[in-house]
Amino acid sequence: MILLYLHIYEQKGSGTLNPVAFTLFGLEIRWYGILIATGVILGLFMAYSNSKLREIEYDSVLDIILISLPIGIIGARLYYVIFQFKSYNGNIIDMINIRNGGLAIHGGLIFGCLAAYIYSRYKKLSFLKLMDIAAPSIILAQALGRWGNFFNGEAHGGPVTYSFIEKFPKFIQKGMTIDGMYYNPTFLYESTWDFVTFIILMLLIRKCKNKGVVFFGYVGLYSLGRFFIEGMRTDSLMLGPIRVAQLVSILGMLISLGFITFSYVKTKRISK
């Protein structure tokens, strides 16, 4: 169905994809929002299934998602605006408008996880157990959300030749043709990597019972893919000459490796 819309909804006369799915009572409903909402809904169903696997009440998982999600969205926008502050020229309306994109996933994860940690401590719940359940849902939502970037014509790489882009399906070629130039579809690489990570996490949650391994597995795997893909993008948030996402990804990989190593050593000691 989505592929059908990819061919139907084009900007009139331009041949490029239209980021607006439809208009409702004068309000433009964009694919970016639809895909994020779809990811959230699928994530909720996935969390319900995984809560049964880990024998945790779904109500607790749902509560933490409903609290962390809006805070995560606020954090994602705040993070993005901080690093792009000069481009807004003090325009507050543009700063809070997320309909055209501009959500930095690292900001969303930091703020969302912080909210989840505070809530779990308040309710005396295991933060790591809850995040193990949430991790597959988060990466699944990210995988779908990248297609929202596709419709917005963002999160792509640098210019490429037609001989490069012609290897991709026609609708990808169309979406990555911007102002007469072909661009590297890095959104597709990240979406694919996220789906692969989702599958790995679903296997982990069934096989590994150690608290936190699924969540930190998510942190490490996502960071690994993001580090390399970020190097190809043209719209990176920058801190001087450094790509912020690559810096955060390195930290994510180190933290993930440290936790999983610690968990493995601890399990070995207990089993002796």
UniProtKB/Swiss-Prot annotation:
Keywords: Cell membrane, Membrane, Transferase, Transmembrane, Transmembrane helix. The chain crosses the membrane at residues 25-45, 64-84, 100-120, 185-205, 212-232, 244-264. Pfam families: LGT. One of its GO terms (molecular function) is phosphatidylglycerol-prolipoprotein diacylglyceryl transferase activity. Pathway: Protein modification; lipoprotein biosynthesis (diacylglyceryl transfer). One of its GO terms (cellular component) is plasma membrane. Catalyzes the transfer of the diacylglyceryl group from phosphatidylglycerol to the sulfhydryl group of the N-terminal cysteine of a prolipoprotein, the first step in the formation of mature lipoproteins. Belongs to the Lgt family. This is Phosphatidylglycerol--prolipoprotein diacylglyceryl transferase. The gene is lgt.
